[in-house]
């Protein structure tokens, strides 16, 4: 498992039972996971990323993936 995958799974565990969400960002230093705040009115069923997080992730580098969890489901990376 990569460091990025480990960070994604750790974030999903911290957010449960709500959905986690974030971006995988490619920077000059390498790939990294950028966790975002789920601002959905129903975070246990849906996700909505905070616009500020989206902007900060974009400023870090190239967004190469959008990631979110399905609480109660199996991880699929």
Please state what every model-predicted region is:
Residues 1-63, 72-77:
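Conserved beta-strand-loop surface patch within small alpha/beta domains used
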């Amino acid at each position: 498992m990569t460091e990025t995958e480990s960070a994604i799974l750790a974030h999903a565990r911290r957010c449960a039972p709500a959905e986690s969400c974030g971006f995988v960002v490619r920077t000059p230093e390498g790939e990294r996971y950028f966790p975002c705040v789920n601002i959905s009115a129903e975070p246990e069923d849906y996700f909505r990323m905070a616009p500020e997080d989206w902007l900060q992730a974009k400023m870090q580098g190239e967004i190469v993936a959008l990631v979110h969890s399905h609480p109660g489901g199996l991880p699929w990376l």
